[in-house]
Amino acid sequence: MATELDKIFLTLAIVEFIIGMLGNVFIGLANCSEGIKNQKVFSVDFILTCLAISTIGHLLVILFDSHVAGLAPHLYATDRVVRPVTVLWHMTNHLTTWLATCLSIFYFFKIAHFPHSLFLWLRWRMNRVIAILLTLSLFLLIFDCLVLEMFIDISLNIIDKSNLTLYLDESKTPYDKLFLLKTLLSLNSFIPFSLCLTSLLFLFLSLVRHTRNLKLSSLGSRDSSTEAHRRAMKMVMSFLFLFIVHFFSLQVANWTFCILGNNKYTQFVMLALHAFPSCHSFILILGNSKLRQTAVRLLWHLRNYTKRPNPLPL
């Protein structure tokens, strides 16, 4: 039977799910309708749509996982539930993270200005660079799935033992393997994080250089390019902040689950972990002028609809 803490956990998980679905469904529908109307799909719209779809899938897996954790935690000890849920969670999380990373790199190439020949060469082949990164992410996903299979097998073997402390004292080999596999899974997250951090640093350098050139030419320090730099930096910084919270929450959740099992601490750490897919879509909407204008029009129509008087009954 669900306790009060379980009910609070499930309520917060459902709230996160609804918030995330509202933002990502809006992004997907807005970009699809725009593409159908214009008969053309731009690179940024394609990345945003794929990101919205992968995040929706991730949110659905999270919702199912939260209900299992809150209502039937004993199922985590069975291979029938823990393996498909864990693999699906990692797959959708991997795709969401890498698509968000590619979006940050796209904004960097689109907005930053450097005279260096390597930057100009990469910028000219921006779509190809994004395609190569997505292909690399798929190879890393295959590697992740193989490591994850071994991680799940060892975890289930440890859970099957009646006395975990005695088992670890008798043989350190399973624990050492678990630590090694968890480290490998964690290291893969550093690649998209490093790419986003590099994009942010170069965007900042480009902004400083652009502002200095404007001051030297006596044109002031604010123009359309400066504002574009700042908007892009805010988006990448927001993504990095959410990604840091997401990454450290994942590490804490992994350790608490491996050491303490599926307890109340693990459940509430997972809520912080799920803030990334829930909130990131609204950062994207606020940072994209087209999506922001569409959202404002939608809210205006909803406001007028709610204020419209009801017809008198016959």
Swiss-Prot record:
Entry keywords, A to Z: G-protein coupled receptor, Glycoprotein, Membrane, Receptor, Sensory transduction, Taste, Transducer, Transmembrane, Transmembrane helix
GO cellular component: plasma membrane
Residue intervals annotated with topology Cytoplasmic: 29-50, 123-127, 209-238, 287-314
Note in the entry: Most taste cells may be activated by a limited number of bitter compounds; individual taste cells can discriminate among bitter stimuli.
Membership in a protein family: Belongs to the G-protein coupled receptor T2R family.
PANTHER family, per database record: TASTE RECEPTOR TYPE 2, TASTE RECEPTOR TYPE 2 MEMBER 42
Name listed for the protein in its UniProt record: Taste receptor type 2 member 42
Native organism: Papio hamadryas (Hamadryas baboon)
Gene that this polypeptide is encoded by: TAS2R42
